[in-house]
Amino acid sequence: MPTLEMVRFEGSLAANLKNEPADVELYWLGQAGFLVRSPGLSFLIDAYLSDQLAEKYRAGVFSHARLMAPPITVAELPSLDFVFCTHHHGDHLDVPTIRQIAGKFSDTRFIVPAASESEIASAGLRKERIVWAEAEHEIHLSDTLKVTPVKAAHEGFEYDKLGRDRFLGYLFEVEAGLIYHSGDTVRYPGLLERIIQSGPQLALLPVNGRRPELRDKKIPGNFNLEEAVQFCLDGKISALIAHHFGMFAFNTIDPELIDQAAPKMHNQLQLIKSELGIRYSLKCGARGSDFASPKEKQT
């Protein structure tokens, strides 16, 4: 039976990325950000590596100062094939980070919701480097990566003037299986059925929840932990890496809640807390099968 292996490594993330991956590897970068690598393929999802929001909202009600330092700088990143953004919010579409990546890697392409055209414009990317994403329009990026954007509801749907979704998730079809990164979303009518139709083995879901006082300030929320777990159980998803916490003091949860909930799954679901300093390895051949119990190693 295939495994989702968790390896706790010593030293910096940059140092550990010097070795070529043998399987599909995921590294959490904070908030909703992940680096995904496999042999011959490397891409980012929603990487927030700057501190731009602290300055943008310095005079605001809620401080956006980072609670965690970026685990890696753009200068330290290995070569990247693709950068994915799920929506226009600055901790998901981080223009300073995108601009630096584009300057460092001339061949990297950026997959961005078509409805985020105005937000990405300030990054100064050449048009041939951008792939516009729209819900349910499959994107064949390479022989080892096919991506399907899926509608997301960040406490509700939003559309641009052309009717295109402002919020997206992505289904990543890689050699080891199917990974679902939901973007910022809640469960909405039809989402479960859509995900069951594709059958991902691994879900990357936000668990920071939502609160009326934040909604009133135009800060929409997401799944809470219980909802994310139930969604995976209902969708027969084998493993959940819970994320979107620990970045901003006003909009997070206690990560110990994830640790407390994990043993209660009784082998129905691998509930895994996002952590820095961990390599999550998705062993090739996992597609179509349940994962065995997660293993953790020290390196």
Give residue ranges: language-model regions.
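Divalent metal-coordination and catalytic microenvironments
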Residues: 36, 46, 87, 94, ...
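Pre-active-site segment of Zn-dependent metallo-hydrolases
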Residues: 11-18, 41-85, 96-100, 157, ...
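Active-site environment of divalent metal-dependent phosphoester hydrolases
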Residues: 52, 89-93, 117-119, 137-140, ...
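Structural motif
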Residues: 41-43, 81-82, 109, 177-179, ...
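Cap/insert and terminal regions of metallo-dependent hydrolase folds
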Residues: 66, 109-111, 115, 186-276
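Metallo-beta-lactamase
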Residues: 2-21, 112-177, 261-284, 292
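Catalytic core of the metallo-beta-lactamase
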Residues: 22, 29-37, 140-201, 219, ...
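Active-site HxH/HxHxD metal-binding segment of metal-dependent hydrolases
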Residues: 52-58, 65, 71-139
